[in-house]
Amino acid sequence: MTGEMSDVWIVVPAFNEAGVIGDVITDLRSIFANVVCVDDGSADDTGAIALGAGAHLVQHPVNLGQGAAIQTGVEYARSQPGAQVFVTFDADGQHRVADVVAMIGRLAAGDADIIIGTRFGPGVSRPPVLKRVVLQTAAWLSPRGRRLGLTDTNNGLRVFNKTVADRLNITMNGMSHATEFIMLIDENRWRVAEQPVEVLYTEYSSAKGQPLLNGVNIIVDGFLRGRMPR
């Protein structure tokens, strides 16, 4: 399968994920030859473990935030010969490789520039009740997200083509990059579609995850920065 996916680059932003990053990279590498882990100033062995598992490694000397790590990873990936398809994939084990394969197939249909995962599509498990309420509220509070017909604006699993990668310029370094991603899709008129995905809420990922209200905070931050229409 890796030969068929030679034009695909997986970007994995990681911060202090030594406990799981090896398995995450190994799972990805079973399908994809090209995985770049951006070690965002981790204090543990995240970078060394990712490198040992077969990932390309780019390191930030200090923690800059997930948005900055994604931008660094995309810049690295888009500079590689033959790179045509780009994926953002969380480092904490929440995302499934099978969903990435399905999303790449959806992108190959050619009627979208970017595919975003959704936890609210048919045939997939829903998040826990409180998290579901917060995520759906965050999506409802996003004018651009509503206009684009998106149901899960904070989903970190994305697959996009080189048109998007070449123009991507994330400036919100932290978790608010999810808001900016939606803004960029809208402003650049990139064609967007959603793909139902499973998100695995393990004990580890739940402990590492953002507070429940973070989804709403991301939208509020976008308003305060003036990056979204009021």
Predicted feature descriptions by range:
Residues 82-92:
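Short beta-strand-to-loop acidic/aromatic patch adjacent to the donor-nucleotide binding site
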Residues 12-31:
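Short, well-formed alpha-helical segments that are part of the catalytic scaffolds
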Residues 39-48, 93:
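A conserved acidic beta->alpha catalytic loop
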